[in-house]
């Protein structure tokens, strides 16, 4: 992979990681169009590792929130009186909500990295989950806010987040849809989606580094991977700021329309043989 491709893919990762359009789906499509074998271990590892850039963008953007949550969590561990504090309960809720995707990701690791990366799955998932997003956006009451989030909310959202292991579903699209169906408002579910992303993405990247470091070195190359990660960080930071402002005033309709168009295009290209599915 050359530097220009790394910069391009890093920018796409940073832009799409937190938008409900599936960053992994986009990377899978683009890696295929750039001539890479999307089933190669080095390509699947590259796709997971560059998400770390988006994670660090989240940590930087929400640094004050994380500092507050960690302080409350630490006090709650030491002092039972703090255990009813909203920040303490929210911290535990995020931890609980992160467990399901870790368990499912490990259990189905081989299928996620091979079979599910087929463009048939990507295109179909983009279209099918658009219907779920549209339904959630339409029926969600949005009467509950971030301070109302409970461990039951994050557990349900965390279970639904497992669907995002299928490229094309979108981790943020899954968590936001589940949150809306739990009655949370758009800003609350968007912020919660950011918080839930950190354990999931860091664990996925760490697993790839530990198990496929040699594949990266021999294939894509660590220089290209590091460059893409840095670009992902910069673009993701801007995307986070934009999304929070956008979602406070608009529905998910623009993302749903985009997903439908992209999914239909992908399926057309594969069905006509213009692009192979794997």
From Swiss-Prot:
<keyword id="KW-0133">Cell shape</keyword>
<dbReference type="GO" id="GO:0050380">
    <property type="term" value="F:undecaprenyl-diphosphatase activity"/>
</dbReference>
<keyword id="KW-0961">Cell wall biogenesis/degradation</keyword>
<dbReference type="GO" id="GO:0071555">
    <property type="term" value="P:cell wall organization"/>
</dbReference>
<dbReference type="GO" id="GO:0046677">
    <property type="term" value="P:response to antibiotic"/>
</dbReference>
<keyword id="KW-0812">Transmembrane</keyword>
<dbReference type="Pfam" id="PF02673">
    <property type="entry name" value="BacA"/>
</dbReference>
<keyword id="KW-0472">Membrane</keyword>
<dbReference type="GO" id="GO:0008360">
    <property type="term" value="P:regulation of cell shape"/>
</dbReference>
<keyword id="KW-1133">Transmembrane helix</keyword>
<feature type="transmembrane region" description="Helical">
    <location>
        <begin position="187"/>
        <end position="207"/>
    </location>
</feature>
<feature type="transmembrane region" description="Helical">
    <location>
        <begin position="254"/>
        <end position="274"/>
    </location>
</feature>
<feature type="transmembrane region" description="Helical">
    <location>
        <begin position="42"/>
        <end position="62"/>
    </location>
</feature>
<protein>
    <recommendedName>
        <fullName>Undecaprenyl-diphosphatase 3</fullName>
        <ecNumber>3.6.1.27</ecNumber>
    </recommendedName>
</protein>
<keyword id="KW-0046">Antibiotic resistance</keyword>
<dbReference type="GO" id="GO:0009252">
    <property type="term" value="P:peptidoglycan biosynthetic process"/>
</dbReference>
<dbReference type="InterPro" id="IPR003824">
    <property type="entry name" value="UppP"/>
</dbReference>
<keyword id="KW-0378">Hydrolase</keyword>
<feature type="transmembrane region" description="Helical">
    <location>
        <begin position="88"/>
        <end position="108"/>
    </location>
</feature>
<keyword id="KW-1003">Cell membrane</keyword>
<feature type="transmembrane region" description="Helical">
    <location>
        <begin position="224"/>
        <end position="244"/>
    </location>
</feature>
<comment type="similarity">
    <text>Belongs to the UppP family.</text>
</comment>
<dbReference type="GO" id="GO:0005886">
    <property type="term" value="C:plasma membrane"/>
</dbReference>
<comment type="function">
    <text>Catalyzes the dephosphorylation of undecaprenyl diphosphate (UPP). Confers resistance to bacitracin.</text>
</comment>
<feature type="transmembrane region" description="Helical">
    <location>
        <begin position="119"/>
        <end position="139"/>
    </location>
</feature>
<keyword id="KW-0573">Peptidoglycan synthesis</keyword>
């Amino acid at each position: 992979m050359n530097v220009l491709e790394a910069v391009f893919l890093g920018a796409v990762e940073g832009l799409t990681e937190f938008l409900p359009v599936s960053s992994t789906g986009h990377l899978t499509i683009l890696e295929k169009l750039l001539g890479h074998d999307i089933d190669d271990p080095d390509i699947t590892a590259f796709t997971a590792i560059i998400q770390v850039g988006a994670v660090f963008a989240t940590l930087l953007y929400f640094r004050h929130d994380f500092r507050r949550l960690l302080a409350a969590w630490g006090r709650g561990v030491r002092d039972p009186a703090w255990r009813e504090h909203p920040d303490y309960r929210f911290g535990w809720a995020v931890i609980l909500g992160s467990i399901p995707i870790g368990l499912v990701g490990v259990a189905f690791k081989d299928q996620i990295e091979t079979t599910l990366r087929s463009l048939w799955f990507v295109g179909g998932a983009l279209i099918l989950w658009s219907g779920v997003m549209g339904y959630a956006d339409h029926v969600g009451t949005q009467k509950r806010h971030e301070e109302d989030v409970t461990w039951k909310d994050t557990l349900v959202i965390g279970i639904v987040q497992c669907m995002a292991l299928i490229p094309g579903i979108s981790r943020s699209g899954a968590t936001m849809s589940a949150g809306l169906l739990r009655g949370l408002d758009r800003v609350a579910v968007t912020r919660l989606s950011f918080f839930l992303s950190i354990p999931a993405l860091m664990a996925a990247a760490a697993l790839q580094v530990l198990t496929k470091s040699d594949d990266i070195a021999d294939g894509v190359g660590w220089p290209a991977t590091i460059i893409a990660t840095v670009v992902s960080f910069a673009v993701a930071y801007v995307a986070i700021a934009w999304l929070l402002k956008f979602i406070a005033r608009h529905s998910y309709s623009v993302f749903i329309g985009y997903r439908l168009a992209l999914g239909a295009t992908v399926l057309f290209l594969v069905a006509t043989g213009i692009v192979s599915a794997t």
